[in-house]
From Swiss-Prot:
Glycans are attached at N70, N73, N109, N194, N198, N244, N265, N292, N359, N443, N535. Cu cation 1 binds at H77, H416. The keyword Aminoacyl-tRNA synthetase does not apply. It comes from Candida glabrata (strain ATCC 2001 / BCRC 20586 / JCM 3761 / NBRC 0622 / NRRL Y-65 / CBS 138). This is Iron transport multicopper oxidase FET3. One of its GO terms (molecular function) is copper ion binding. Iron transport multicopper ferroxidase required for Fe(2+) high affinity uptake. Required to oxidize Fe(2+) and release it from the transporter. Essential component of copper-dependent iron transport. The gene is FET3. Gene3D superfamilies: Cupredoxins - blue copper proteins.
Amino acid sequence: MMVPLLLSTYFITAVYGATHTFHWTTGWGNRNVDGIKERPVITCNGEYPWPDVRVAKGDRIEVYLTNGFNNTNTSLHFHGMFQRGTNQMDGVPYLTQCPIGPGDTMLYNFTVDENVGTYWYHSHTDGQYEDGMRGLFVIEDGENNKNFPYEYDEDVMLSIGEWYDTTVDVLTRKFLNLNNPTGAEPIPQNLILNNTMNLTWEVQPDTTYLLRIVNVGGFVSQYFWIEDHEMEVVEVDGVYVEKNTTNMLYITVAQRYAVLVHTKNDTSKNFAIMQKFDDTMLDVIPKDLQLNATSYLVYDKSKPMPEQNYVDSIDDYLDDFYLVPMDKEELYPEADHVITIDVIMDNLINGVNYAFFNNITYTTPKVPTLLTVLSAGQDALNPFIYGTNTNTFVLKKGEVVDLIVNNQDTGKHPFHLHGHVFQTILRDREFDDAKGEKPHSFNDSDHAAYPSIPMKRDTVYLNPQSNMVLRFKADNPGVWFFHCHIEWHLLQGLAVVMVEDPISIQNTASQHLTANGLQVCGNVKVPTQGNAAANDSDFFNLEGQNVQHKSIPTGFTKKGIIAMTFSCLAGVLGITMIAIYGFSEIPEPEIKVMRNLHLNPEDVLEKTSSSSVISASNSSSLEDSRNQKKKFIFF
């Protein structure tokens, strides 16, 4: 099945003006997205895919999101938006808002006055965006993108991702399960491009395209290349960069790249557009899993479609660490606040495999963290009130923060920080467990020199068993998530919270929940005041807060000791009963059986007695032997 690009983008909302208003209602419908299997997907106003949105810098966005599900909450996050002064519009349940209950409507209302470039939006609830609740979001730099720093002829959006043939709720029940003790992530069935497979992109010769590529998947990073065509990277995650030419991109989930592609003058041949799984992220590779997906760059649709394109090596992809921002912003000063977090994956006492930062798996509070900030007064400066299982750090206004992430896990992790772009000032190499290498934590006295002009973006990958250092300024008051964007790992709890300049949040009217936001809370019966335990009379009393399951204890517990004791007693009693049975007299029915078989009971007994280490002596008569056994039993 080949789908032309124009069919995949017909649902783009491309309007210009001061305010853009959208009314979206969630629902379910059956679609055959990958051309192989029909399955339920999340629809928008009964349609699928969700609309891609294109606006201009300075425009206002109004999205009325109605939850059309019968029994499931929902939410909407505009990925990469700074939301300066409008933290309540960031769309994270139990962090910046209450979940939107069935039948309810929430208005997301904000202005895009700082962001430009390539973004996307998605549900931030229970992995729903893997079921299709997502779309691309482009903010042009001035009307018709007139302030974009590079020349091009046409602007094209491409979303890439993986696709499952089963809904996320079913997969999650199997994933977060004691029968999956290693935490093996569900394996996707296919790779998709613009919500389909075998896409055709018809191009004009000698034309420069601005190609915006967004990985809207929830798990696997992808390699992306176009046969016999170079790509010039000009933007990453909304940050303009100096041109950097490459033949291949490595794109983690949630990352965005804008590249310039110049087409050929010759129209005699069509070319392959290639996607490839990063199969190192898969615990197992099923025999029927196709690791590559082929779409088509078409100069002449009357010509044959190309075969899939192979490359000599997938290691020759662009390393985004070395990209240079066009604004050439220098390395921020030495950090005022250093936060070190260690990534581990482990099991808790319920047998389920979880993800941890510093041995804490993120557990939602009873009161959304932003509402705790707004109701806590000066106590908002103390991270304790936000709960012992939210991994919350309080940042002072304007301080430079170093976020050191040590990966004790053997897998890659793409990390995303809400409300900011950060400078990636260090990313160590992979340390390969298969080669016997151990996890390598950051060493402040022994590391590579930081770049003078670091790369900036909002989503970056961390190598296996490695470390990285992200530096950013606490210049955007709000409650911001930092989390792994592998959706399975977020469901496992791989997240921390940054409460940034809480007193400024309290003193800014636009940071307070609207009447609609408070009504949403009331409808799902979520408290709007108090600490993580919903205690609004004593913010330092966390009794009743949500907490993670207990760790698996080391050594023997009381239950284990008792179980072992009774097991040993049962074993001793069992051996004793066997011995007693062995020395008991032969029942008359058994003697009759022996005689019917022409066996002498005395001979059988003599052989049995001579082989027993317990017997006192061999007997010459059956009666003597019986008497000995009776005495033994009596004893």
